């Protein structure tokens, strides 16, 4: 099967995440898109409480439940240690060697991927589907893709998706200020309790 992977803290999951998954599914003829809430992300200073993690997982479950080709994967959420993309991909290949994996990410992640732990191990494990953002023009994206393909033999495809300037950080900030998050989030999602 052709499996798209969307990882992240999803605090909260929002329409931008779901649109990326849907557009990747259609454009690259994926069989499923797996959403992986990260249980212990290495880039966060404070670890989630069990309650906060359960809240994030439940938000993702609710967000993907009505889409037959979206799946919630608890692979990273169940771990007590930090989860890293390279390791998750290795584990998926060991568990499901028949699958072909497509890692879905935004332009900001494509430009910072060399800072990820053992980032070189990611490239042989998947095709990266990179979605553009407004702040990265197509020339910069093409140059970064060519750089990663040339230097690391990465397989990268450009994901054509709507450019929505939505981030979970913006949503959390708006909610903390008692400002509306209507139409940004789904009705049943909200930032996790701290």
Regions found by a protein language model. Give the residues of each.
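N-terminal catalytic cores of NTP/NDP-binding nucleotidyl/phosphoryl-transfer enzymes
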Residues: 1-29, 34-39, 106-109
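Residue-level signal for inorganic ion chemistry
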Residues: 14, 60, 103, 128, ...
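Residues at the starts of beta-strands that form the adenosine-phosphate
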Residues: 31-33, 100, 127
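N-terminal Rossmann-like or analogous alpha/beta NTP/dinucleotide-binding catalytic cores
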Residues: 42-121, 125
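A short helix-to-beta-strand connector/capping loop
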Residues: 68-70, 151-156
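Short, aromatic/basic amphipathic alpha-helical patches
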Residues: 140-149
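Conserved small/polar residues in nucleotide/adenosyl-binding loops
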Residues: 188-194
